[in-house]
């Protein structure tokens, strides 16, 4: 239990508080509409569907208030910077912003479904009551408002049978129109957010996600028409529904039961979302301001297997290890921004990214930079680009530990280029505050040739460490997870050579996936009574594996070895 608390305690606490707030709001507002006399006649008309529609609406307000906050990248970077004095456990919660964003989105989808279904029943019953296709009591309540000086309870005022009556409500009432629009927006946003769409059709994901603007506008005005109505406070003093509801034929004829008066609930949603919407507007203004700042591409390097490196400079640009930026190239697309991990170190006088050419946008950038041509390209011919960032990630905490495990899978190796470079600069310059003493680096890939630029970096570090007589500082393992029989024979023939046949490094490439249980046990035994940071940039399946290993191999007491799991999310 103690092992689990070390890694997941605060995260679970945050989730439980969030779930608790959802349960509290649902129960509270269910009782608000299910018990008080104010909605006595509304319940007689709509039944339990009234409370079942309003309770999830309150939860929707709460979650729509939260949904924008995890994607305010500049706000999160500010909080991460201002919380530098806090423990890494606190800062790690900011690195799970996208996970929380997705959880809130699914909660919105759940409450939207409940809210919509309940209101479909409400509309059906209201329409039926207006066309005398209901019980006499509901018909009588629905007729209130037809005479002068009466206020209505049933928001359906036209006498049109279903299903035409329901469609009429959907296309004429503000709540119906906005409800249809925001539900369609939500469906499109969620269905285009699957992993397959994001990876293969990023443009679809990008553009449909911007339907959130329509979603929030529709949400803010959804209740402006006040169709959910209850008895007014003044009317309740004159007309007590529990005493008068059985004498509906005598309403207005006897003193104690005058015709009840009704009014709609004032819209509340805008009060929940105006704050986050203002923060997000500020976020977008900051992004726009940054995008207008001049960025100079100082060098474009073409690496094997369609990978390019962009080295850039921007006035006032300051970065930390493992951070990422968003890049826009107007020549390729005037609206699209794409995230890339910085591969340069803070100590260098430029910042760089490595881009694998795998889609339409990257292919367009590849051609715009002249990388498809053999001849040298002049700098003035390079395209203009805009940069937003940098933004913080879990990797910033790498210097908070004495021992770290860095695990990169495929292109997920890029954040660690920045870390390894920076560590080496600090080591060579004998940085007095360098706490980090040992790095265990794991690189899992199906084809190392696709990332030869990183193998070149490792070769450089290997050579420099030998010159400094400190080969024990960095222990690295390159694991090739994909090969065929001919490659296996070739590897076997050259196994006894001094340098690895694939990477040219002295450390030989391993074939297959690491035995993580053995790796964690070995590292834990070599560093007792140590907090070991585990940093991953890779797929969710590997994240689950490493997270479980961190929990199972951490000691339960306050002393002993503790593996602290961190994952890149951007």
From Swiss-Prot:
Cytoplasmic face residues: 2-9, 73-95, 195-203, 286-570
Gene3D superfamilies tied to this protein: Nucleotide-binding domain of ferredoxin-NADP reductase (FNR) module, Translation factors
Reactions catalysed according to its record: NADPH + 2 O2 = 2 superoxide + NADP(+) + H(+)
Cofactor(s) for this UniProt protein: FAD
Annotated positions binding FAD: 199-200, 337-339, 341, 354, 356, 361-362
PTM characteristics: Glycosylated. Phosphorylated on Ser and Thr residues by PKC during neutrophils activation. Phosphorylation enhances the NADPH oxidase activity and stimulates its interaction with RAC2, NCF2/p67-phox, and NCF1/p47-phox.
EC number: 1.6.3.-
Residue(s) of cross-link: Glycyl lysine isopeptide (Lys-Gly) (interchain with G-Cter in ubiquitin): 161, 255, 294, 299, 306, 328, 334, 381, 506, 567
Glycosylation-annotated residues: 132, 149, 247
Entry's transmembrane regions: 10-36, 47-72, 96-130, 164-194, 204-222, 268-285
Subcellular localization: Cell membrane
Subunit structure: Component of the phagocyte NADPH oxidase core complex/cytochrome b558 complex, composed of CYBB (heavy chain (beta)) and CYBA (light chain (alpha)). Component of the phagocyte NADPH oxidase complex composed of an obligatory core heterodimer formed by the membrane proteins CYBA and CYBB and the cytosolic regulatory subunits NCF1/p47-phox, NCF2/p67-phox, NCF4/p40-phox and the small GTPase RAC1 or RAC2. Interacts with NCF1 (phosphorylated form). Interacts with NCF2; the interaction is enhanced in the presence of GBP7. Interacts with RAC2. Interacts with RAC1.
Protein name per Swiss-Prot or TrEMBL: NADPH oxidase 2
Organism of origin: Bison bison
Primary gene name: CYBB
């Amino acid at each position: 239990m103690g092992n689990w608390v070390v890694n997941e305690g605060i995260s679970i606490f945050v989730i439980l508080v969030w779930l608790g707030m959802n349960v509290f709001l649902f129960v509270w507002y269910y009782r608000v509409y299910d018990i008080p006399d104010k909605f006595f006649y509304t319940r007689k008309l709509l039944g339990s569907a009234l409370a079942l529609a309003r309770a999830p609406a309150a939860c929707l307000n709460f979650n729509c208030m939260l949904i924008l906050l995890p994607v305010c990248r500049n706000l999160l970077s500010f909080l991460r910077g201002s919380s530098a004095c806090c423990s890494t456990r606190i800062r790690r919660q900011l690195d799970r912003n996208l996970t929380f964003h997705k959880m809130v989105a699914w909660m919105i989808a759940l409450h939207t479904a409940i809210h919509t279904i309940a209101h479909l029943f409400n509309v059906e019953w209201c329409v039926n009551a207006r066309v005398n296709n209901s019980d006499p009591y509901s018909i009588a309540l629905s007729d209130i408002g037809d005479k002068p000086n009466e206020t209505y309870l049933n928001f359906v005022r036209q006498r049109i049978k279903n299903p035409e009556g329901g469609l009429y409500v959907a296309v004429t009432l503000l709540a119906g129109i906005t409800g249809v629009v925001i539900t369609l927006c939500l469906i499109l946003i969620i269905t285009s957010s699957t992993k397959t769409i994001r990876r293969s059709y990023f443009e679809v994901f990008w553009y449909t996600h911007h339907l959130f603007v329509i979603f929030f506008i529709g949400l803010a005005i959804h209740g402006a028409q006040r169709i959910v109505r209850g008895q007014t406070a003044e009317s309740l003093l004159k007309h007590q529904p529990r005493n008068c509801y059985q004498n509906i034929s005598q309403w207005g004829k006897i003193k104690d039961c005058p015709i009840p008066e009704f009014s709609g609930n004032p819209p509340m949603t805008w009060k929940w979302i105006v704050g986050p919407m203002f923060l997000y507007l500020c976020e977008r203004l900051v992004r726009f301001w940054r995008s207008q700042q001049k960025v100079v591409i100082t060098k474009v390097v073409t690496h094997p297997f369609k990978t390019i490196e962009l080295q850039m400079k921007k006035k006032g640009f300051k970065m930390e290890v493992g951070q990422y930026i968003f890049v826009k190239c107007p020549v390729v697309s005037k609206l699209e921004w794409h995230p890339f991990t910085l591969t340069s170190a803070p100590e260098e006088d430029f910042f760089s990214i490595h881009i694998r050419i795998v889609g339409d946008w990257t292919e367009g950038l590849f051609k715009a930079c002249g990388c498809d041509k053999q001849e040298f390209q002049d700098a003035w011919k390079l395209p203009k680009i805009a940069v937003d960032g940098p933004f913080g990630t879990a990797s910033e905490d790498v210097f908070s530990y004495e021992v770290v495990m860095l695990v990169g899978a495929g292109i997920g190796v890029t954040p660690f280029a920045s870390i390894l470079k920076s560590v080496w600069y600090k080591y060579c310059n004998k940085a007095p505050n360098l706490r980090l003493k040992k790095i265990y680096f794991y690189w899992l890939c199906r084809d190392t040739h696709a990332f030869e630029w990183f193998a070149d970096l490792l070769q450089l570090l290997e050579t420099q460490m030998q010159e400094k007589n400190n080969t024990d500082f960095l222990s690295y393992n390159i694991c090739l997870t994909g090969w065929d029989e001919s490659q296996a024979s070739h590897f076997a023939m050259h196994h006894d050579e001094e340098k690895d046949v694939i990477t040219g490094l002295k450390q030989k490439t391993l074939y297959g996936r690491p035995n993580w249980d053995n790796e964690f046990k070995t590292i834990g035994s070599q560093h007792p009574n140590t907090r070991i940071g585990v940093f991953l940039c890779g797929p969710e399946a590997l994240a689950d594996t490493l997270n479980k290993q961190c929990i199972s191999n951490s000691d339960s007491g306050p002393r002993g070895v503790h593996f602290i799991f961190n994952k890149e999310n951007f």
